[in-house]
Design a protein with these regions (language model features):
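Solvent-exposed alpha-helices and their adjacent loops that cap or buttress functional pockets
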Residues: 52-55, 127-129, 152, 172-174, ...
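Active-site/ligand-binding-proximal alpha/beta "capping" segment
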Residues: 184-231, 278-282
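Phosphate/pyrophosphate-binding betaalpha-module
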Residues: 136-203, 214
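Short, acidic/small-residue loops that bind anionic groups at enzyme active sites
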Residues: 155-168, 203, 217-240, 256
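Glycine-rich beta-alpha loop segments
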Residues: 8-9, 14-158
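C-terminal amphipathic helix plus adjacent low-complexity
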Residues: 2-4, 8, 12, 276-282
Length: 282
């Protein structure tokens, strides 16, 4: 090997080494533990800058269960459960499957009602074209899909904040392209849910919905965020899982904290609460 060939080889080895990469193009570097503060900052900034450029001023945040299915899916689940129970009437798993299928089918009404609510909100923001009251969800299936779908069917925009999970989660197809953001950090995602929020509507859901609800209640309780209507959709459902009055009776929250939220039972009532809170009529 000539001296030039040896020199060229050494230069190539230098340039191929990760240390030579531009810092912002070095994924191993960017993903390192020491760079977590930078990743947190970027995850906060990217959606903020995008939404600013799109003129999105405020949102209506909709939470709810991923397992709240549209009617046809609920009916299919019920048919499957019935068939399994008829085949093995003494099987405890088949009995349990039947109970769950009955409840999923019952809750399918919430999918349709959420869809209708999102249409009401979207028809308003379409009328004024001012970047206000844009539907925002977590981007998944169930209630989140219903809200994005309602906005889509009304011919308007809606956005979503998706999250990376150990199991694959893809965004639903009704989100407006260019308005779906993927997050790695739950904390930054939660912050973005509330930064532009002018209302929070919690449809029936599980741990994730409860997490977002109690985060918002805590921030309102402590005066750490803007005053917004916090709406629990379906008093029947929420009374069944949380006894808020018990918390007040036990003295662990103030009686006044019960005024931080309210219940609604129809799409129209829910939208009326938001309109009244913000002082506008249609």
């Amino acid at each position: 090997m000539s001296d030039k060939e040896a020199s060229d080889k050494r230069i190539q080895e230098i340039m191929d080494h990760p240390s030579y990469r531009l810092a912002y193009m070095d994924q191993d570097f960017i993903r390192g533990e020491d760079l977590r503060p930078l990743r947190l900052e970027m995850e906060l900034l990217k959606p903020e800058m995008c939404l600013d450029s799109l003129g999105i001023k405020s949102t209506v945040v909709v939470f709810g269960g991923t397992q709240v299915a549209p009617l046809e899916e609920g009916e299919a689940m019920m048919a499957e459960a019935k068939a399994a129970l008829e085949k093995s009437p003494d099987d405890p798993n088949a009995k349990r499957m039947m109970i769950r299928a009955e409840r999923v089918l019952y809750k399918s009404k919430y999918y349709e009602e959420c869809r209708e609510f999102a249409k009401l909100v979207t028809n308003h923001n379409k009328q004024f074209h001012d970047g206000e009251f844009i539907i925002k969800t977590g981007g998944g299936p169930g209630i989140m899909e219903a809200a994005n779908r309602g906005a889509f069917e009304a011919g308007g925009q809606s956005m979503a904040l998706n999250i990376t999970l150990p199991f694959e989660q893809t965004p639903n197809s009704y989100i407006t392209p260019g308005m779906c953001f993927q997050f790695n950090y739950f904390a930054i995602r939660k912050m973005h849910f509330l930064l532009r929020a002018k209302a929070l509507v919690c449809f029936p859901g599980g741990f994730g919905t409860l997490d977002e609800l109690f985060t918002t209640l805590t921030l309102r309780q402590t005066g750490r965020m803007q005053d917004i209507p916090i709406i629990l959709y379906s008093k029947e459902y929420w009374d069944g899982i949380i006894d808020f009055q018990f918390l007040a009776d036990e003295g662990v929250i103030e009686d006044s904290h019960l005024d931080l939220f309210q219940y609604t039972n129809s799409p129209e009532e829910t939208w009326d609460v938001i309109k009244e809170f913000h002082g506008f009529k249609e």
